[in-house]
């Protein structure tokens, strides 16, 4: 279904990944505190030069580092683009949230994460999410969920929480907005689902925590919303998929939040399944059709589940050599899949060779490099953060956050590599 187009080597372990909503741009946050953005080659769905798009489709494109800087003291834990993609939010173990211009990387605003009420220390962030042009949500280790009104970032009160909720007893591990109802006048979500510990909760922008599920007796780590499913019986055709720490994907019917509706086993490794750390839904027009979820596992596997039959239809490996968990997973505006984990970022495209005549396929194989793909090393000469409103260059490196590591599990899929990007050293 997908083949590896390019592998980019990172300078430090990946802790966060974000994909631009309107342009082929990927941002990464690293254990070293660095934040870096890459611009991918244009795709068929871009409005760019058709010749460039054709070159990228044939495997001849260039991935450019737009900017790179040490943004945080310690590690960068989470990243998120604004709704229109003009700003990039980052938050680190230094207890600071910074807002940067996506194009230049220059910091335009910053504010401190509220301290942990239990000990008065830094309450490290776990996620940041731009719900709308008006609202920003920040989750922390202490289970706090802070809501900010960011319409006027110049106001002194702009970066003080308008409200704080605690939907879980443990840290907030994932957040998924619920689609706005037909009665919505803004077109933006005002409710969202979060996971934390062994519970799922629904929170409303104005009314706070509305419902919390029963204890699922398993760790809930990731989530994604799926719409357009079959409406049978009382089903509204909308479900939230939740990835668990034991290799099971659970489905939750919208509006029925007390308990899960269905279960799909993704991994059956001995000693308990691998954790399902991240989930992304294939965009319309990508893949063989139907609703398909891509799931990133703690052992570095990528598995694809077709909803309805609820069956695994394909499997890939983020890294053939190392068993690093998949930390980031998503699709850019052109439909390419981006997976991140360890010190590696992979760009995947849909397989194209199935529809190529045998003669043409032979010619392509002769022209392809022997190893099928090339590694892209990070640029060591990128600008530092000296020209920005930063003071983190003088800090000593902090200890990296411990990452979840489990035993080997699952069958490794053979790597693809018929396409590649040229010019990547």
Swiss-Prot record:
Record's keyword annotation contains Cytoplasm: no
Disulfide cross-links: none
Transmembrane regions: none
Classification via InterPro entries: WD40/YVTN_repeat-like_dom_sf (IPR015943), WD40_repeat_dom_sf (IPR036322), WD40_rpt (IPR001680), WDR55_POC1 (IPR050505)
Subcellular location(s) per record: Nucleus, Nucleolus
Start-end of each WD repeat: 9-48, 71-110, 117-158, 219-262, 321-358
Pfam families attached to this UniProt entry: WD40 (PF00400)
Keyword Ligase: no
Residue span of region Disordered: 354-425
Residue stretches of biased makeup (Basic residues): 399-414
Compositional bias of kind Acidic residues: 356-368, 378-396
GO CC list: nucleolus
Keywords: Nucleus, Repeat, WD repeat
Similarity remark: Belongs to the WD repeat WDR55 family.
The protein's name: WD repeat-containing protein JIP5
Gene (UniProt): JIP5
């Amino acid at each position: 279904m997908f083949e590896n187009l390019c592998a980019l080597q990172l300078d430090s372990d990946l802790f966060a990944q974000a994909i631009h909503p309107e342009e082929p741009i990927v941002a990464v946050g690293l254990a070293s505190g660095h934040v870096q953005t890459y611009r991918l080659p244009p795709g068929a769905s871009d409005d760019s030069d058709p010749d460039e798009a054709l070159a990228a489709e044939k495997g001849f494109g260039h991935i450019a580092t737009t900017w790179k800087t040490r943004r945080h003291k310690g590690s960068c834990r989470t990243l998120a683009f604004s709704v229109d993609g003009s700003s990039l939010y980052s938050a680190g173990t230094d207890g600071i949230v910074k807002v940067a211009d996506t194009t230049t990387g220059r910091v335009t605003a910053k504010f401190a994460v509220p301290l942990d009420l239990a000990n008065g220390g830094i309450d490290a962030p776990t996620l940041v999410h731009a719900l709308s042009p008006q609202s920003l949500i920040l989750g922390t280790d202490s289970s706090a969920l802070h809501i900010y009104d960011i319409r006027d970032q110049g106001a002194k009160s702009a970066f003080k929480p308008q409200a704080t909720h605690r939907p879980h007893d443990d840290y907030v591990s994932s957040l998924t907005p619920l689609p706005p109802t037909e009665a919505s006048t803004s077109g933006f979500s005002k409710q969202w689902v979060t996971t934390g510990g062994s519970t799922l909760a629904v929170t409303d922008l104005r009314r706070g925590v509305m419902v919390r599920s029963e204890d699922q007796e398993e760790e809930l780590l990731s989530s994604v919303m799926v719409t357009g499913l079959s409406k049978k019986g009382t089903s509204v055709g909308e479900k939230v998929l939740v990835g668990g720490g034991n290799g099971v994907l659970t489905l939750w019917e919208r509006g029925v939040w007390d308990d899960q509706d269905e279960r799909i086993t993704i991994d059956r490794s001995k000693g308990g399944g691998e954790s399902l750390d991240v989930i992304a839904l294939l965009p319309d027009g990508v893949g063989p059709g139907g609703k398909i979820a891509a799931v990133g596992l703690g052992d570095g596997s990528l598995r694809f589940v077709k909803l309805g039959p609820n069956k695994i239809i394909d499997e890939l490996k983020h890294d053939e050599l190392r068993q690093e968990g998949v930390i980031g997973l998503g699709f850019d505006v052109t439909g390419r899949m981006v997976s991140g984990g360890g010190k590696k970022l992979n760009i995947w495209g849909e397989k194209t060779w199935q529809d190529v005549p045998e003669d043409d396929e032979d010619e392509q194989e002769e022209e392809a490099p022997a190893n099928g793909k090339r590694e892209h090393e990070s640029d060591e000469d990128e600008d530092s953060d000296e020209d920005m409103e930063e003071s983190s260059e003088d800090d000593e490196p902090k200890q990296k956050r411990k990452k979840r590591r489990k035993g080997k599990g699952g069958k490794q899929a053979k790597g693809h590599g018929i396409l590649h990007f040229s010019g990547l050293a």
